[in-house]
Regions:
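Terminal or standalone catalytic/regulatory effector modules within metabolic enzymes
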Residues: 15, 30, 36-54
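Active-site beta->alpha loop and helix N-cap motifs at the rims of alpha/beta catalytic domains
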Residues: 33, 48-153
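Generic hydrophobic/packing signal
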Residues: 9-10, 20, 36, 40-43, ...
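N-terminal amphipathic alpha-helix/helix-capping segment at the start of soluble metabolic enzymes
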Residues: 1-18, 66, 70
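N-terminal phosphate-binding or glycine-rich loops at protein starts, especially the Walker A/P-loop
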Residues: 11-33
Length: 153
């Protein structure tokens, strides 16, 4: 049985650059047609990481920005995904379980199909709830391990 290979466009550090290189949503929607026209991506990373915080710095409403940015991809049949920091999913410090659970429902409502979860500590106690919450919200859950080198990890 042959396996289908799907390519994903990932902006690894773009959303984490404290606004230095992150385009506004009006700029993002202008490049969406070119990405779609390439015809090689089944999935596009549209938010997560620092994306929403940067929207706020620009004075944009993150809810509106994510919806606008994901819309052209959905119309073209392309799934969208986001970076998720597991326990630190909403900020750089731990977030309570009830807030994390709501987070996935909101992201799905905004138009995000897939959550790509990682935990800097590779701690399954932080990753497992993310998988559950994503599935409960109707999202696809992908997880990754981090390459960590230290005497402790």
């Amino acid at each position: 049985m042959k396996k289908e290979i799907k390519f994903s466009l990932v902006f690894r550090d773009m959303w984490q650059s404290a606004g230095k290189y992150v385009p506004r949503v009006d700029q993002l929607v202008k490049v969406a047609p070119a990405i779609i026209e390439m015809g090689c991506f089944a999935r596009v990373e549209t938010n997560g990481g620092g994306f929403e915080q940067v929207n706020l710095l620009f004075g944009e409403n993150p809810n509106k920005a994510v919806r606008e940015w994901t819309k052209p991809f959905h119309e073209a049949g392309i799934q969208t995904h986001m970076l998720d920091r597991a326990l630190n999913g909403l900020r750089m410090s731990p977030v309570p379980a009830d807030v994390r659970k709501l987070f996935y429902k909101v992201k799905k409502a905004q138009g995000t199909d897939i959550t790509r979860t990682f935990c800097g500590l590779n701690d399954i106690r932080n990753i497992a709830p993310s998988i559950t919450y994503a599935h409960e919200a109707g999202m696809i859950s992908q997880c990754s391990l981090c390459i960590t080198h230290s005497p402790i990890h």
